[in-house]
Amino acid sequence: MMITLRKLPLAVAVAAGVMSAQAMAVDFHGYARSGIGWTGSGGEQQCFQTTGAQSKYRLGNECETYAELKLGQEVWKEGDKSFYFDTNVAYSVAQQNDWEATDPAFREANVQGKNLIEWLPGSTIWAGKRFYQRHDVHMIDFYYWDISGPGAGLENIDVGFGKLSLAATRSSEAGGSSSFASNNIYDYTNETANDVFDVRLAQMEINPGGTLELGVDYGRANLRDNYRLVDGASKDGWLFTAEHTQSVLKGFNKFVVQYATDSMTSQGKGLSQGSGVAFDNEKFAYNINNNGHMLRILDHGAISMGDNWDMMYVGMYQDINWDNDNGTKWWTVGIRPMYKWTPIMSTVMEIGYDNVESQRTGDKNNQYKITLAQQWQAGDSIWSRPAIRVFATYAKWDEKWGYDYTGNANTNTNFGKAVPADFNGGSFGRGDSDEWTFGAQMEIWW
């Protein structure tokens, strides 16, 4: 009994050490931004985005507190085989008060198994909700290839000249499909599940320092038995992507060409949309018909121009041509140079211009935005974070058209459609004006 008692403290110490090591193995990653800002004409900070554009230049132009908190752990490993559990919860509030309650968004919960298939060494099999191989332009916070959602797949299959990945994911739209109720009436209240099937071949070395990635995505509305879609709904569509990445000037340049059809044109990033309604209880949806095509040509990157200068840049042309004439032509160009005074202090400027033409009216909306920021960051790279910055932003815009959201889809035949700025004596779009803002912000990823 004495021997047992003497051994007990040692056993407890060993168990505590093992538990401590296991706890330390938890990976904590994430992203966050928050700050305070004012508008020159009074009030809290306003943010500026061109009507019809799918994004905005973000430096000194973000008006919310946003965070993604990721917890993950390798829960099993034997040789080169392993299982990894990953989660991600996101939050967003208006940053106007001390206490701002919000419901979290459960963005990720998945398990990834590596090297589980003997005859596919290096591959990963996965299932669950996941950010899946997302492609974006950081300076405008624009995701041009992103099929994230609940899904499953097999990725990084070595085919000799590249890596092959296969995946299926899902997103849903409110309304848009119906079941027969009574009195020959269809009640369009059921959510429509949209499936996306993704095939991509990446890491193909085609020139010194350059790689090519090709992808095909097919999206379709997946109805329950005995349900039907709203008449004119976009049932399915395709997205084709080619991206060349070149290592250059201690950074990279990406040149991207994408072509989409029908339901894959709305967001243009790989998620199917067009079978559902945009607002609850709108039986006759204004945007169910996304039939048409989209062409996107994009070039963006980040480079180093010597010891003291870094720069991000983007140039993009996007043409969404819909059969219902409610599409847009959007082109944007911008730069973000950074001068490093010391390894942890820099001055950053962002200049961006957007121009969006309405397919329906032929009118154009345009905006240019300039931000100057003094920044302190954890390192001497334009990608170094965390960063604390003070900024001043000036924006000027001239908008000739806007979207008509007066009334509802039942009473307004133009609901959700592009109309001239002075349509029916109204005031659509943001008109011709300018504004400036100033403030401070922190941004971090880890």
Swiss-Prot record:
Catalytic activity reported: beta-maltose(in) = beta-maltose(out)
Compartments in which it is found: Cell outer membrane
NCBIfam families tied to this protein: PRK09360.1
InterPro entries membership: G_neg_Bact_CarbUptk_Porin (IPR050286), Maltoporin (IPR023738), Porin_LamB (IPR003192), Porin_LamB_sf (IPR036998)
UniProt name for this protein: Maltoporin
Signal peptide coordinates: 1-25
Site (Greasy slide, important in sugar transport): 31, 66, 99, 252, 383, 445
One GO CC annotation: pore complex
Recorded topology in the membrane: Multi-pass membrane protein
Source lineage: Bacteria, Pseudomonadati, Pseudomonadota, Gammaproteobacteria, Enterobacterales
Annotated site residues (Important in sugar transport) in this chain: 143
Organism (species): Escherichia coli (strain SMS-3-5 / SECEC)
